[in-house]
Regions:
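Structural recognition of alpha-solenoid helical scaffolds
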Residues: 11-14, 18, 22-26, 30, ...
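Residue-level signature of catalytic and energy-coupling elements of molecular machines
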Residues: 7, 19, 68, 109, ...
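A glycine-centered beta-loop-beta connector
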Residues: 89, 102-116, 153, 161-179
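Bateman (tandem CBS) regulatory domains
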Residues: 63-75, 128-137
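Divalent-cation
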Residues: 100, 114-119, 133-142, 157
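Single conserved hydrophobic/aromatic residue that forms the stacking wall/gate
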Residues: 1-6, 10
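Non-transmembrane, extramembrane segments of multi-pass ion/lipid transporters
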Residues: 178-193
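The conserved cystathionine-beta-synthase
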Residues: 19-23, 28-34, 77-98, 140-157
């Protein structure tokens, strides 16, 4: 009995460590397929920040933008200077994968626009975010069907896009690698189907 219990603890700890190495959207995909009790055990062993981020993803069906989103997102305020943004970015251990832009939000976390990394690098340090941010491209609604998300990415040649909830608050982003998975699944279904 003891060796079995010890083995279970070891396996659980091994699973928790393996999960920590995955992207948050991949963790959500795995957790959605586990029994609720096991999912809750894994969540309870995560940091509060990671748990909250994962719980956001778990609230959406996996065939929606919300199911694809990753909460590893960088956002800034419109009144920040470019110098402040650069300093903030340097303070990060690393940028999230496929970061080609950061998002601009107000104090209530409502999406206002996006700021391309290339614009940050080529703008004067004293300029304000609001002076150079892009506002034309609308964020993706979390409830949008994943195939429609793929179409938006394809049509606009996107690497990443913001995702907002029904109130327009930034809740994450979708990156091209997630969209490629949707395209592959759709192609496989069409091939078999």
């Amino acid at each position: 009995f003891r060796s079995s219990a010890a083995s279970d603890v070891y396996k659980r700890q091994e699973l928790i460590e393996a999960v920590k190495e995955l992207e948050l959207d991949e963790i959500v995909d795995i957790l959605q397929n586990l029994p609720e009790e096991r999912m809750n055990k894994i969540l309870s062993n995560m940091s509060l920040v990671d748990r909250k981020r994962i719980e956001i993803g778990l609230t959406f069906p996996d065939n929606t933008a919300g199911g694809l989103l990753n909460t590893d997102v960088i956002s800034v305020r419109p009144n920040n200077s470019i110098n402040e943004v650069i300093s903030y970015l340097r303070d990060q251990e690393e940028l999230p994968e496929n970061t080609d832009k950061i998002f601009v939000v107000n104090n209530e976390n409502e999406y206002l626009g996006e700021l391309l990394i290339s614009r940050i690098l080529t703008s004067k340090p004293t300029m304000l975010v609001r002076e150079i941010m892009e506002t034309e491209f609308l964020p993706i609604d979390a409830g949008l069907d994943d195939k429609e998300v793929a179409t938006i990415f394809e049509r606009n040649n996107l690497i990443s896009s913001s995702v907002v909830d029904k109130d327009g608050k930034l809740i994450g982003r979708i990156t091209i690698d997630d969209v490629v998975d949707v395209i592959r699944e759709d192609a496989d279904q069409n091939l078999l189907g």
